[in-house]
A protein has these predicted regions:
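Cleavable N-terminal export/targeting peptides
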Residues: 1-37, 177
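Flexible, solvent-exposed loop segments that connect beta-strands
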Residues: 33-40, 71-94, 112, 151-164
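Membrane-embedded beta-strand positions of outer-membrane beta-barrel proteins
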Residues: 42-44, 71, 96-98, 114-118, ...
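Short glycine/proline- and aromatic-enriched beta-strand/turn motifs that initiate or cap beta-hairpins
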Residues: 27-69, 96-98, 103, 120, ...
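Gram-negative outer-membrane beta-barrel proteins
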Residues: 48-52, 77-83, 104-108, 124-126, ...
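Outer-membrane beta-barrel "beta-signal"
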Residues: 94-100, 164-177
């Protein structure tokens, strides 16, 4: 038990140090959540699809100041409770998406980007809306809500409703290249 107490203290001081470092980042840097044409964003984070936890990894490429295209892989944990085994391949969805970025239209601060769009994946197709906030020129956070509307190409006989009709929430970090 004593070891756990020290580990918890270590984690607390680790997060405190990280938070302190973030506060020391110069605020004079021109952080932009959306640079427009040629901008590349890579993001990764926690995903929750209909109550199932997982991870998400994706990228956006800006075609213009308003439109981007990209791809995304989402994986959620799918467990077959009847047989007690994981069904790893049933939990993924690979999607292509297109987004419209509202920053210039809404005259938002350059550190903030609000977007909406559509996606088509191996399991489902849907609509999404999201927001990005950049702390620095390269690093930021994002949050996204996606409503998976209908089934597409995936053959999910046993787990057909992992994505279909479910709301997906995701939060994480974004990196600009």
């Amino acid at each position: 038990m004593k070891i756990m107490k020290y580990i918890d203290k270590f984690r607390f001081f680790h997060w405190l140090l990280l938070f302190g470092c973030l506060l020391c980042v110069p605020h004079s840097v021109q952080a932009q959540a959306w640079d427009g044409e040629g901008d590349i964003k890579v993001y990764a984070g926690y995903a929750n699809v209909g109550g199932r936890s997982g991870i998400e990894l994706g990228s956006d490429y800006a075609l213009s100041d308003y439109v981007s295209v990209g791809g995304q892989v989402t994986y959620v944990n799918v467990k077959d409770y009847d047989e007690g085994r994981d069904r790893a391949l049933m939990g993924y969805d690979l999607s292509l998406m297109g987004n419209y970025h509202w920053a210039e239209v809404l005259k938002l601060p350059s550190v903030l980007d609000i977007y909406s769009g559509a996606s088509v994946g191996l399991r489902t197709a849907g609509l999404q809306v999201g927001v990005r906030y950049n702390f620095s020129e390269a690093i930021g956070v994002y949050g996204q809500v996606r409503q998976n509307l209908f089934k597409t190409f995936g053959d999910d006989v046993e787990h057909g409703r992992v994505y279909q009709g479910k709301t997906a929430l995701s939060v994480g970090l974004t990196v600009t290249f």
